[in-house]
Amino acid sequence: MPSNPPRSPDVSAIQRAGQDALQSKNVSIEKLSGYLYRNCRLTTSKGFFYILKTRPSHNCRLLRHEEGRLEAEACALQVLSTRPDLVSARLIVLDTTTLRLGSSYLISGPFGGSIFADVEPSLSPQALASIDKSLGQYVRRLSSVAGPAFGPLRQVQGYPGSQSWARTFATMLESVLRDGEDALINLPYEAMRDVVRRHRASLEKITQPKLVLLELSADENVIVDAKNHRVTGLLDYASAFWGDPFMSDCFYKPTASFAEGFGKLPNGDTDERIRQYLYVLYHSLLAVVRQCYRPSEDGEELEARRDLTTAMRQLSAGSR
């Protein structure tokens, strides 16, 4: 946690920052809920909108991997800036000082269309299925982007990557395990570390680093064309890294329509099944730890603990 916790940005200060960045005097501000980092929608007279993000309140407990998301998103947008078929939004401003808003902030855009969470209640089951299929197609295109090494995208700016997916995955899992240990959550920590070590060979079968968005599928993150029922982009690329695309949360419990859009899902051979259970282990562990750090009433922890138990049982039975 930063030594000087960010204060809540003043709306007038946000408006001035938006006007300067977008070179427009007509910028309306709307604070959005449902996001870890504080988000404001900046709307101009041109019909597009932009997103301004600042750090969470100092009362919000962050996990290790949730720090530095503004810088991570800026890097992701730069990496994807040559792919207009994937990302129409661009990095407008990254200000890592606290002088202007009392917190570092990022502005990205322009975004066309609607945030899926805003329009979902008004859509028919057929429209929702079309959007799920379109999301699968979008993720397939994202997954085609190759990187130089496994690990953070920021390795292109001097951060060392790894040539081992097994090592990278173990490092990512270890970060969440330590968050759980710090909070004294009752979990089988050493058993989880052990199953990752025992299934290292299955992870090492992944040799080509590809673009992964770890946290992709939330309705608040997906931008859609509500008339044509298709996905046009994402609101947040901060969880991007180079790894195995099947680790993304959109493969945690995919719908049939998503699977139709993406194509073949990884449930064929033994190594694929082992990797998928390892990824279920990661996401269910993350859900349990996150619930402890930031309690909610959505019942996520109980289901996540069941998934965690199932993954551990399958991985223990399938050990080599």
Question: What spans do the regions from the language model cover?
Answer:
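Conserved catalytic motifs of the protein kinase core domain
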Residues: 47, 103, 208-209, 230
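ATP-binding pocket architecture of kinase catalytic cores
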Residues: 30-175, 179-182
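A short helix-loop-beta-strand connector motif used in the catalytic cores of GNAT acetyltransferases and
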Residues: 38-40, 204-209
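Extended, well-ordered alpha-helical scaffold segments
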Residues: 131-134, 186-199, 299-311
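Juxta-kinase regulatory segment immediately upstream of eukaryotic protein kinase catalytic domains
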Residues: 1-28
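Active-site Asp-x-Gly
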Residues: 165-166, 178, 209-212, 217-219, ...
